[in-house]
């Protein structure tokens, strides 16, 4: 029997006990979502293992659709209008790049009567790029700023699995020796170490190093420990992948970010940097077209590893002119395959120059569209949506990737595309500017007069 005190105790009937373990944001839901997303991302990343990649190509990347499916399922049962309102503008910005490439390619196809096979190849690349972008958005929708941590864990698991699966083919001792030799000689890869050159994931670890070295939170002891742990892991996998052009690029942009992070920068600075990048690209294309880059690097004894030969072979396929409209998205893959079949090249390697590749494919107008969205409009957006530190993070990540665009094929890598969008968007979630409060403004002097009269009347007749 209850005592009098228990009977007289006021009960709070406003608190509702969840009827199920799966109420919104329950620990069980969050654990299941976390495990599911990590499994999907790690499984998709495992597709970068060379035996799997050689057998089925980029098909395992479609496993990442599971993350999008989880986000849709979660939204179906527990819709969060606030998060949807926060994410629709960045999503629209991200997808505008894909839409621009698609519609401009349609113009080129109609004008040049392109083959159906070329259109299919272009659309498939746009679809995979869209999957990467939407996966990043879905992960941020589910976990906000924690999405960066889960993404890091996933790619670390994938890279570790690839390292372990590659050992039986070479033996444990030979694998360790090959890896040590590669690290000591700064890239003299052979055997096991060559198997670990996972191009896409390696470049992604460079982006993560930039984030954890400069921008990751470090207020509490737990945050400091996590930051140090993930930074060490990313550095390890980054060095194991050993992309020599990426190492100085990471160091350079870490220093730039550290220099600018605490400084007050005028609002026009970052968009101006983007405009300067576009002008640099045009100058770079001119120098590539007329062999200036090749002669300069050869004069210093730098081995271009056949890049100058590929770049010169591309000259008949484009014009350095504002009237050049391009050949269509993914056209370069067509001519590379043609050169390989004709015996002009030993391996069907791409240009190793994504700036040239984009210009050949989408022409001068399309190139300006592609570069303006990424280098000018997106920094402007992040300044308005969040703050300058978010803008600095985006441009630091993009600047690092831009260095690789000049000598590699990273502009449309699946994981690089995903990381570039995910890191900035997740970081912006905690730095997003609150909406401006709405202040009543009178439409006319007559309205002000009526308001004043009403106030006088209330003060005259009010008993208070």
Regions picked out by a protein language model, each given a short descriptive name:
Residues 2-80, 100-109, 166, 401-403:
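N-terminal signal-anchor transmembrane segment
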Residues 63, 90-103, 113-141, 150-156, ...:
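Aromatic-anchored transmembrane helix interface
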Residues 106-115, 160-201, 340, 346:
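Membrane-interfacial helix-loop-helix modules of multi-pass inner-membrane proteins that assemble, modify
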Residues 149-176, 195-260:
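Alpha-helical transmembrane segments of multi-pass inner-membrane proteins
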Residues 153, 157, 269, 361-402, ...:
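Hydrophobic transmembrane alpha-helices and their immediate junctions
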Residues 164, 168, 258-300, 316-319:
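A membrane-periplasm/extracellular boundary helix in multi-pass inner-membrane enzymes
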Residues 209-213, 395-405, 409-446:
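Transmembrane alpha-helices of multi-pass inner-membrane enzymes
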Residues 298-362:
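Long extracytoplasmic/lumenal interhelical loops at the membrane interface
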């Amino acid at each position: 029997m209850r005592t009098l005190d228990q009977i007289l105790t006021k009960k709070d009937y406003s608190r509702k006990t969840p009827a199920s373990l799966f109420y919104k944001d329950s620990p069980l839901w969050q654990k299941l979502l976390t495990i599911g997303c990590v499994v999907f991302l790690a499984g998709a990343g495992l597709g970068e293992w060379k035996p799997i990649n050689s057998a089925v190509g980029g098909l395992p990347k479609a496993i990442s659709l599971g993350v999008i499916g989880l986000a849709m399922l979660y939204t179906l049962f527990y819709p969060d209008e606030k998060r949807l309102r926060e994410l629709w503008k960045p999503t629209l910005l991200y997808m505008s790049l894909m839409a621009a490439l698609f519609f401009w390619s349609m113009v080129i196809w109609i004008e040049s009567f392109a083959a159906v096979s070329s259109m299919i190849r272009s659309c498939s690349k746009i679809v995979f790029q869209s999957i990467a972008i939407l996966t990043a958005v879905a992960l941020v929708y589910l976990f906000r700023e924690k999405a960066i941590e889960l993404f890091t864990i996933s790619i670390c698991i994938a890279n570790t699995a690839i390292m372990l699966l590659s050992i039986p083919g070479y033996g444990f001792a030979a694998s360790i020796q090959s890896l040590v030799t590669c690290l000591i000689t700064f890239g003299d890869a052979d055997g096991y170490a060559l198997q670990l050159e996972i191009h896409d994931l390696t470049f992604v670890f460079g982006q993560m190093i930039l984030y954890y070295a400069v921008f990751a939170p470090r207020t509490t002891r737990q945050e400091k420990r996590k930051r140090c742990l993930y930074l060490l892991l990313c550095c390890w996998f980054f060095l194991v992948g050993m992309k020599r052009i990426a190492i100085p690029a990471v160091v350079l942009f870490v220093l730039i970010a550290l220099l600018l992070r605490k400084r007050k920068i005028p609002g026009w600075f970052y968009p101006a940097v983007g405009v300067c990048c576009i002008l640099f690209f045009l100058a770079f294309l001119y120098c590539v077209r007329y062999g200036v880059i090749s002669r300069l690097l050869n004069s210093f004894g730098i081995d271009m590893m056949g890049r100058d030969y590929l770049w010169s072979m591309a000259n008949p396929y484009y014009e350095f002119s504002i009237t050049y409209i391009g050949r269509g998205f993914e056209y370069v893959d067509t001519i590379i395959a043609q050169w390989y079949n004709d015996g002009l090249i030993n391996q069907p390697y791409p240009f190793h120059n994504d700036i040239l590749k984009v210009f050949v494919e989408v022409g001068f107008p399309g190139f300006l569209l592609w570069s303006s969205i990424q280098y000018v409009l997106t920094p402007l957006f992040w300044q308005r949506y969040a703050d300058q530190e978010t803008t600095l993070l985006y441009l630091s990540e993009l600047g690092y990737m831009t260095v690789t665009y000049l000598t590699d094929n990273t502009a449309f890598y699946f994981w690089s595309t995903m990381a570039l969008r995910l890191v900035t968007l997740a970081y912006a979630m905690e730095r997003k500017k609150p909406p401006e409060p709405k202040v009543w403004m009178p439409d006319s002097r007559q309205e002000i007069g009526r308001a004043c009269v009403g106030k006088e009347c209330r003060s005259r007749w009010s008993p208070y």
